[in-house]
Amino acid sequence: MTDGPCQTCGTYRNPALTVDAVAVRGEGAEREVLLIQRGQEPWKGSWAFPGGFVDEGEDPEIAVLRELMEECNLDGKVRDIISVRGKPERDPRGHVVTIFYSVESDGVPIAGDDAAHAEWIVLDDVKLDKMGADHSEIIRLLQNS
C-alpha cells in the first residue's frame, strides 16, 4: 500500500471503479441469472455479470444501467447494492473496486460491446468454475439466499 502522492508526478494512485449488474428473475428452482460470456481479456471466454468501468463524472447507478444496455441490450432498474469487492489483487489490470448492484431486468439479451454471448441461466445450473474474477462468490450468495 502506498501512502500519499507519487514521488515523481505528485498524483495519487487510486483504485479504478467498476459496476456489475446482478439481474435475477423467476422463483424457486426456476430462478435465472443474467450472465455474459466475456469476449475480451481478462477472463476471455468465462462467464460474468454484465458490467464495466465507471466513466469520469458518471454516477455508478447510471453506469451499471449503461453497461447492461451495452452488453445485453436490456433496460433495467437499480434496486440496491448486493456487495462491494476491492481486494487489490482481484483484477490483473490493477486495483479495481466493484459495486455489484441488484438490477431488475427482463427480456431477451443480445450480446454487444465486449460480451461474446449473453443469456439467462438457471441459477442452480451456473458452473462456478467457469465464472470470471470473483463473480462466483456473488453467485454463491444468490444461490444461498
Model-derived features: where do they sit?
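NUDIX/MutT-family hydrolases
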Residues: F100-S102, I110-N144
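Active-site-adjacent beta-strand/loop module that shapes the phosphate/pyrophosphate-binding cleft
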Residues: R85-P109, L142
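Conserved Nudix-box catalytic region and its N-terminal flanking loop in Nudix hydrolases
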Residues: E30-E70, L74
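A short coil-to-beta-strand element that immediately follows conserved catalytic motifs
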Residues: L74-S83
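Acidic, metal-coordinating catalytic segment for phosphate/diphosphate chemistry
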Residues: M1-V22, G28
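A structural signal for short, well-ordered beta-strand segments
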Residues: A21, I81, Y101-V103
